[in-house]
Amino acid sequence: MTQPNPNKQSVELNRTSLYWGLLLIFVLAVLFSNYFFN
């Protein structure tokens, strides 16, 4: 079993984790803004 390009898979994984991190930061920013502006 040989993978054609294992580096591509790791890059996709890092990109997905990066998107989840940005989404988490965005949600936390919205929650904090709602908390401070109420």
UniProtKB/Swiss-Prot annotation:
Membrane topology term: Single-pass membrane protein
Name listed for the protein in its UniProt record: Photosystem II reaction center protein L
Oligomeric and partner information: PSII is composed of 1 copy each of membrane proteins PsbA, PsbB, PsbC, PsbD, PsbE, PsbF, PsbH, PsbI, PsbJ, PsbK, PsbL, PsbM, PsbT, PsbX, PsbY, PsbZ, Psb30/Ycf12, at least 3 peripheral proteins of the oxygen-evolving complex and a large number of cofactors. It forms dimeric complexes.
TM regions (residue ranges): 17-37
Annotated source species: Physcomitrium patens
Disulfide bonds: none
Places the protein is found: Plastid, Chloroplast thylakoid membrane
Classification via Pfam families: PsbL
Family that this chain belongs to: Belongs to the PsbL family.
Gene Ontology biological-process annotations: photosynthesis
